[in-house]
């Protein structure tokens, strides 16, 4: 994923103003900012999406999305005239602007603000979402200011108010499985422990909270929807309180009240395993990940690490540059990834000569290892510097660019596809690990715990065998 620089955004905004005639814009109920965002999103999609865009579908998508949004918000009689695309994008942009203006004029008075978003912006956002949704690409989407801020929190290491735990929704038990607890964090202070199961938040059952996400058939999208719901209720302003109902070893505990604090969540955690095996877990490929990884590897090296296990399981990706930088810590030279634009132009990214001294390396992957994680996994596999352990990865072989907008929202558009150093296209295919190791769906284990994590056990066994081979030669 790439974030577009402000200068590029400024150029886009100048372009969008020219797309709508001055007389039309002056008579419109849309503000100049809304016009820029609406037309700019259309221009970006048609110019930068990695495949050819059906203009008629884009206009139809805007119209349908607005009508659906209005009906969902109790405007039962909402209707808008059909749009007819032409070969000229300026004409299409003007028609789109006119359609949204009509919707705002006719129906904005019937809506109320939502999360401080005005009715006219709600309708504009719905139109933008419809334009982007027309390409039927799950990764091309509109991000509201709240959603974009949440994305930045995860990727940029932004602090947030929270309870200081990592968790995974358990679809079988309809609870939240506590994966880890930040030392001296708010949850640690009230005695919450890894392996605890959260059954209710502020008196509302987790099963009830997660119900809206259960209709999603795709596992990763359902997990993302569940985590989005839960983070929305667990997070809040520092100093505010949240009440959790917790189960431990099958027994209900007394509900605990936790006071939220400012949480600084690292993207890299590390520890030394028995036998001097350095274990490094990456949760995301964010802005600070490469720096955090460098520090972790330096610390493990000073402790005498003989080999490394890099855990990319359930890492959904992040920034393209972070994937290149992380890969470069293990690959001394040569290609990391090749990115291909819609025009068919290939850009190859090479290792940056910052690699650590070679040591046996195992990389843990699973079905949720995706995007930037797969760039790193594919580069390590193709270069031969490490061995993948686990199950086949997700298969997200495309790159998204994020275009921020002035009101704090953004559009995320798939702008390119990528290939591994050996030219493999892993999109919708995934990457097969050399060593297959699975975890039964009903197994209750703590990932990263050498006493009960079969994939980690397999990875450690592999690197130990390589250490033994090096010793005997």
Which residues does each PLM region occupy?
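Bacterial N-terminal signal peptides that target proteins for export
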Residues: 1-8
